[in-house]
C-alpha cells in the first residue's frame, strides 16, 4: 500500500538574519522534518531555539533562506506573498501566543471574519459554523462578548475557534496556554485535541506544559532537530 504524503514536509531548511558587514546569524538549520497527516506533535525547547521561527516558516509568514517547505502538497517557497496568504487562510490554522483578537468585534464575529477572508465556506453557513465550533470549545454563552469581556482562557478558546473555523488540514499553535493556569490549560488543550482528532487535523504545538505533552503522539526537541549554531557566520543571508 502506497504511503500518503506528509501534511508538512521540510527539507534542508535554513533561516538566517543579516547582521551587516557580510555577516548573518543562522537561527534555523533543519535537515528533514515530516509530519504525517492527522498527527499531533508538540515542539519543545528553550527560549531562542527557533520554535516560533519554525512555525512562521511553515505558515508561510516568513520564507527560509534556503530549502523546501511543503504544506498539504504545496511548495510554499516559490509562491508570491498574496498566494501564501490565501493558502494560509484556507489551509493553515494559526493560534498566536498573543491571541490577536480584534477588540471591536464579538467572539462570534472574530471567528466569522476568518471565514469571510478565506472564502472557503459558503456565507450562509458561516454563522452556524462559528456557533458550532465556539460551542464545542465551551463558549456557547459567550458568543456576543467582546475580547475585553472574556477571561484569558476564553480569549484563547476564541483564538482556537478562529484558527479552526475553515477546517484547515494543518493547525499551528505557539505556546497557546503560556498565560493560563494548569487546570484551564488542560481543559483548553483537550478540547482542541478532540476537535482536531475528529477532523484528522495535523497539529503542531509549541509548548512545554504537561497537558500539551500528554495529548501529543510525538514530542520533538528543537535542540535535537535544529542544527543551527546560533553564531554569526561570514555569509550574508536573509
Could you describe each region identified by the protein language model?
Residues 1-16, 228-238:
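ABC-family P-loop ATPase nucleotide-binding domain
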